Amino acid sequence: MARGRVTVLGRAERTGDKRQIERFLARHEEARGYATFKDFHFYRVAPTRAHLVAGFGRIHWIEGGALLCRGNMDALSNAESEILAHMNADHGEALALYAERLLGLAPMPDSKPWRMTGIDPEGLDLEAGGVTARLGFDQPVLDPDAARAELVRLAKLARSRQAGSDSE
């Protein structure tokens, strides 16, 4: 194992928070049919610390608070479902450009288009045909206006690149 790896330790806490449930289901559509079963429950992990192996001789323990986003992300979190709905309904081309030109992923067939499944201060999550991807932001975004500006910036950057090019 030459690559770095991290193990997150924490408390699993049952949750009924509708936003957390919708975030999970956006990423795991196949679970939606089971979500209303009486024996199906949702949990969140409250990190207490993490064990990082960053390479040979580079092993560290990290406190849980250092794993969490700094700053108030309530505004972005409250708007996440609307941002996802808007991007997926109106900006499918931009999502494909993010995946193909910024992340270097293969084009997907029209029957399985890229869709945004999440957004948080550090980046956005994409999914298409069972393939998932993460596109990080250069700077944290904490509210819908900052998210919009970053999504527009990324779309312009992606459009400026030739298909298959690495240059910015």
Q: Where is each model-derived feature located?
A:
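C-terminal edge-of-domain segments
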Residues: 35-168
